[in-house]
């Protein structure tokens, strides 16, 4: 009996020791942030050889990046047989899917590539369901734009920009022109793609409210400006009631109100682009993903030369559009945290890892090592043929002297969304 008891006690001690040695996902991330890519890749091979990492993301290109990552690991260790399975949920269901996996007894997903900073902040970061990992070689990389891209870690910034059809005589020289009387910009509904709603939240932040005020001041005096002035005046008590702190918040609310009342809701940016580049879309305008221009098929009726990017025009005043981000995060219940960290490092610190996204205009890595030059995408045989496709790059688009994009900040969106979201919904609902 004593021998049996001793054996049981010994086994219990061994199990306790094993559990003590088991690393939490948080502990893995803390260690991983001090390691080079080479060290991370070795850990990934050790952890996931013969296993499958399940990733989930808003971008289907994660599958391409995953295949490249596995190929790279196999070059390091030809005996490595790990795989990556990537899925892309539909209809904004990614948050539901992730939370269900985290709460389940059988955890499947290890990491995610996710958009919508507001929901990420409130549903995932504030709750601790998603964990941020910052690769050492990213944080210490030369020229990496760390601020604004580290909390949470951004794989890329994408832009949606104001464009207009140039077949007619109408021009748009000021961002307020897109909410002028009778103008109806083509735009995805704010509740069908929530990054668009985040754009509206961000307009009330001081920097962007100031952009709108400066653009308003640049408008010529007359009936059109008087119409806007009346709406701004109407918004002064609203700004106070909503607790907005920016001095020029009434200008932001006026812009939001008019934009929501007037935009022509579309199901997707692809159809918006396909409409605007036709000869028949005279004087129409829209706010859409810049990279859609890459897919335009030239014909007698359709051409990239039938549209203009508003911010590229000389003398343009105000915001040129908005920027949202794809964020890389590790689930707190990740079955393969080391491999997740290594995969994230691969995508954010190597040109091969970012290639699935970097091959197109309109998507920007914070790491210059990953970026490809798209400044001459509109050139054909050395001739500037489609000027609108010549991407001026992240720094130009986000600068006060350039495109003045409204850049998503998850913390700010989360701060104002509760009340401001309802306010926007009332406007949209009354259209």
Annotated model-derived regions:
Residues 49-53, 79-82, 107-111, 182-186, ...:
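Loop/turn elements at helix/coil->beta-strand transitions in domains of secreted/extracellular proteins
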Residues 46-47, 104-108, 146-147, 153-157, ...:
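Extracellular/periplasmic catalytic domains that process cell-envelope and extracellular macromolecules
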Residues 23-33, 38, 391-431:
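Conserved C-terminal helix/tail region of periplasmic/extracytoplasmic solute-binding proteins
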Residues 322-407:
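Mature extracytoplasmic/periplasmic domains
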Residues 34-49, 59-81, 162, 296:
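Short, polar/charged alpha-helical segment
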Residues 51-71, 84-97, 107-271:
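Extracytoplasmic ligand-binding site segments that recognize negatively charged/polar headgroups
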Residues 1-49, 431:
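Short, low-complexity disordered leader/linker segments with a strong preference
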Residues 247-251, 261-333:
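Extracytoplasmic/periplasmic substrate-binding proteins
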């Amino acid at each position: 009996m004593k021998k049996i008891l001793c054996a049981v006690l010994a086994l219990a001690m061994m199990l306790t020791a094993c559990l003590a040695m088991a690393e939490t996902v948080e502990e893995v991330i803390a260690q991983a942030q001090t390691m080079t890519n080479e060290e991370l890749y070795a850990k990934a091979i050790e952890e996931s050889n013969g296993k499958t990492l399940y990733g989930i993301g808003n971008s289907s290109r994660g599958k391409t990046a995953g295949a490249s990552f596995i190929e790279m690991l196999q070059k390091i260790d030809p005996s490595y047989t790990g795989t990556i399975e990537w899925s892309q949920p539909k209809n904004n269901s990614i948050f539901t899917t992730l939370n269900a996996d985290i709460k389940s007894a059988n955890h499947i997903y290890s990491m995610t590539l996710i958009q919508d900073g507001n929901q990420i902040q409130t549903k995932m970061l504030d709750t601790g369901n998603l964990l941020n990992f910052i690769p050492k070689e990213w944080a210490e990389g030369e020229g990496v734009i760390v601020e604004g891209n580290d909390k949470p870690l951004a794989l890329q910034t994408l832009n949606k920009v104001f464009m207009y059809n140039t077949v007619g005589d109408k021009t748009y020289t000021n961002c307020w022109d897109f909410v002028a009387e009778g103008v109806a910009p083509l735009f995805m509904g704010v509740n069908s793609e929530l990054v668009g709603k985040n754009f509206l939240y961000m307009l009330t932040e001081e920097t962007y409210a100031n952009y709108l005020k400066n653009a308003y001041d640049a408008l010529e005096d007359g009936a059109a400006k008087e119409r806007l002035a009346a709406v701004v005046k109407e918004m002064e008590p609203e700004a106070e009631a909503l607790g907005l702190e920016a001095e020029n918040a009434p200008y932001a609310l006026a812009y939001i109100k008019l934009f929501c009342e007037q935009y022509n809701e579309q199901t997707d940016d692809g159809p918006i682009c396909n409409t605007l580049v036709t000869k028949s879309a005279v004087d129409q305008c829209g706010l859409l993903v810049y990279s859609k221009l890459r897919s335009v098929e030239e014909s007698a009726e359709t051409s990239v030369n039938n549209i203009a990017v508003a911010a590229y025009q000389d003398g343009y005043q105000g915001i040129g559009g908005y920027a949202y981000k794809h964020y890389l995060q590790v689930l707190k219940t990740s079955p393969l945290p080391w491999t997740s960290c290594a995969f994230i490092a691969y995508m954010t610190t190597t040109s091969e890892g970012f290639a699935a996204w970097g091959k197109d205009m309109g998507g920007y890595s914070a790491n210059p090592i990953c970026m490809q030059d798209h400044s001459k995408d509109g050139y054909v045989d050395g001739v500037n043929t489609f000027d609108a496709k010549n991407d001026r790059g992240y720094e130009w688009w986000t600068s006060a002297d350039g495109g003045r994009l409204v850049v998503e900040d998850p913390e700010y969106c989360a701060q104002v969304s509760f009340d401001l979201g309802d306010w926007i919904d009332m406007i949209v609902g009354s259209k």
